[in-house]
UniProtKB/Swiss-Prot annotation:
GO biological processes: mitochondrial tRNA methylation; tRNA N1-guanine methylation
Catalysis: reaction(s): guanosine(37) in tRNA + S-adenosyl-L-methionine = N(1)-methylguanosine(37) in tRNA + S-adenosyl-L-homocysteine + H(+)
Region (Disordered): 478-509
Cellular compartments per GO CC: mitochondrial matrix; nucleus
Gene that encodes it: TRMT5
Protein keywords: Cytoplasm, Methyltransferase, Mitochondrion, Nucleus, S-adenosyl-L-methionine, Transferase, Transit peptide, tRNA processing
Descriptive protein name: tRNA (guanine(37)-N(1))-methyltransferase
Keyword flag Calcium: no
Subunit: Monomer.
Function: Involved in mitochondrial tRNA methylation. Specifically methylates the N1 position of guanosine-37 in various tRNAs. Methylation is not dependent on the nature of the nucleoside 5' of the target nucleoside. This is the first step in the biosynthesis of wybutosine (yW), a modified base adjacent to the anticodon of tRNAs and required for accurate decoding.
Transit peptide per record: 1-57
Natural source organism: Macaca fascicularis
Binding of S-adenosyl-L-methionine, residues: 289, 327-328, 355-356, 387
């Protein structure tokens, strides 16, 4: 933070001292002894001071010490350790600069003073002057405005044009719970030095938090603050276990607000409805859903092995692709059917309720055999999405000799997008090696790895993309009469550095 301090030694020429620091501390060394003594004398002389004093509005001296951000607009210190929210305990009075102006010129003046005006939740920047009905007080930012010299040149010019005195006064502003931000409240309540949770994943009307152990004693308060400070949020929940069950959903507890977990979300132009307590949904994967969707073109085929409620299947179906979507969770299956109808793609998506391996070795195998019989010109590109990061790599074993006995076609090798977590120092290499080990073939030269997101410290979510080698799909590679020789595998561009470039997929189609 850059701070400008006005120094006027002995009442003569002013100088601005520029300090670059993160907090502001009182420093009397900048104030000459004579000035300090004078202000102390005045403060001890009520007879002198009462002439210019008002209850909440009084003249501001040119030299003023200022509290740092962490103090001036922080809740009262006695809320520290509060576990049950008491909104009345957050009342506080702060002293801020104001500018008195005629009420008829306020709107014209505010356009020029917008950057100098105070901006706090629930606080009007212009208020009535308690002592003059024909005037208004513009509340100013105490970290930008110290004296009239603190205004920008343009602002001073407008003040002069409108015949407004730049005299800065001070005003006792009463702050309440409504005027503090969620982070400020939680930072004041939780033990000093502890991490503060101010972020969450929004799922419709639900705020989904992942609280740490030291935050659990304050969980109900945290939940209520999230509801209070985020319009549209009516329920706050906390995950109480990892996603390690067969249905990919997690147990949660409602911290505050309503118990209703039926929600509706909008992602990438599509609407999804579901019971958040019974299915898996992660709003942080929105970009990844779009990335995969953009890789397919009209006429392509998508097999979504762990489809959830449809965030891959539905957008792809909208592109006039043929989609086969599967999920083992009966609730996900139910809402997948519902969302396909809701988004008017139910005629383009075939939906299954099977284990992932059974889906691959059943419907997927059958459809691939059907597609193999098509002529080269009619064969579509086939994509298989496997979004189950905790276990998806294990399911790659289902591709081993999946098409054995069928005529080998190197023009028809499905493209796999398989997701995984990694805690390795080189996560891309780790994912390649683990996937290759399951398939029994090296993927170093024919795969790309995309960083999806950072899940936790030293834990990444990645997507490895590759064409399934013919040596994996066919045990005995009987040549298709259309093919005279196997083309060499193309080396796909890697993403070791996890660049923002799109994943490049080598394809012979």
């Amino acid at each position: 933070m850059v701070l400008w301090i006005l120094w006027r030694p002995f009442g003569f020429s002013r100088r601005l001292l520029k300090l670059e620091r993160h907090s502001i501390t009182e420093s009397k060394s900048l104030i000459p002894l004579a000035w300090t003594s004078l202000t102390q004398t005045l403060s001890e002389s009520p007879g002198i001071f009462l002439l210019g004093q008002r209850k909440r509005f009084s003249t501001m001296p040119e030299i003023e010490t200022h509290e740092g951000d962490s103090e001036l607009f922080s809740p009262p210190s006695d809320v520290r350790g509060m576990t049950k929210l008491d909104r009345t305990a957050f009342k506080k009075t702060v002293n801020i600069p104001v500018l008195k102006v005629r009420k008829e010129i306020v709107s014209r003046l505010m356009r020029s003073l917008r950057r100098a005006a105070l901006q706090r939740p629930g606080i009007k920047r212009v208020i009535e002057d308690p002592e003059d009905k024909e005037s208004r007080l513009i509340l100013l930012d105490p970290y930008k405005i110290f004296t009239h010299d603190s205004f920008e040149k343009a602002g001073l010019s407008v003040l002069e044009q409108l015949n407004v005195s730049p005299q800065i006064s001070k005003y006792n502003l009463e702050l309440t719970y409504e005027n503090f931000k969620s982070e400020e409240i939680l930072r004041a309540v939780l033990p000093e030095g502890q991490d503060v949770t101010s972020g969450f994943s929004r799922v419709g009307h639900i705020a989904h938090l992942n609280l740490r152990d030291h935050q659990l004693p304050f969980k109900q308060l945290i939940g209520q603050v999230m509801i209070d400070k985020n319009p549209g949020i009516t329920s706050a929940v906390n995950k109480i276990n990892n996603i390690d069950n067969m249905y990919r959903n997690f147990h949660m507890e409602v911290l505050s607000g309503e118990q209703n977990m039926m929600t509706k979300v909008r992602e990438n132009k599509y609407t999804y409805e579901f019971d958040f307590s019974k299915v898996y949904w992660n709003p942080r994967l929105s970009t990844e859903h779009s990335r995969i969707t953009e890789l397919l073109k009209a006429g392509d085929v998508l097999f979504d092995v762990f489809a959830g409620v449809g965030p891959f299947a539905i957008p792809v179906a909208k592109k006039n692709c043929t989609v086969f979507a599967n999920d083992l969770n009966p609730e996900s299956h139910k809402w997948l059917l519902h969302n396909c109808k809701l988004n008017k793609v139910d005629q383009k998506v075939k939906i299954f309720n099977l284990d992932g391996k059974d889906f691959l070795q059943g419907p997927v195998k059958e459809e691939l055999i059907q597609l193999l019989s098509l002529s080269k010109e009619r064969k579509p590109s086939v994509h298989i999405v496997m979004n189950l990061p905790a276990k998806a790599i294990e399911f790659l074993s289902a591709f081993k000799w999946l098409l054995d006995g069928q005529p080998c076609s190197n023009e028809f090798l499905p493209i796999v997008h398989c997701y995984s977590f990694s805690k390795d120092a080189n996560p891309a290499k780790d994912v390649r090696q683990r996937a290759g080990a399951v398939l029994g073939i090296s993927l170093e030269a024919c795969s790309s790895v995309h960083l999806v997101r950072n899940v936790a410290p030293n834990k990444e979510m990645l997507c490895i993309t590759f064409q399934i080698p013919a040596a994996v799909l066919y045990k005995n590679q009987t040549k298709n009469p259309e093919n005279h020789e196997d083309p060499p595998l193309k080396r796909q561009r890697t993403a070791e550095a996890f660049s923002d470039e799109k994943t490049q997929i080598a394809s012979n189609t």
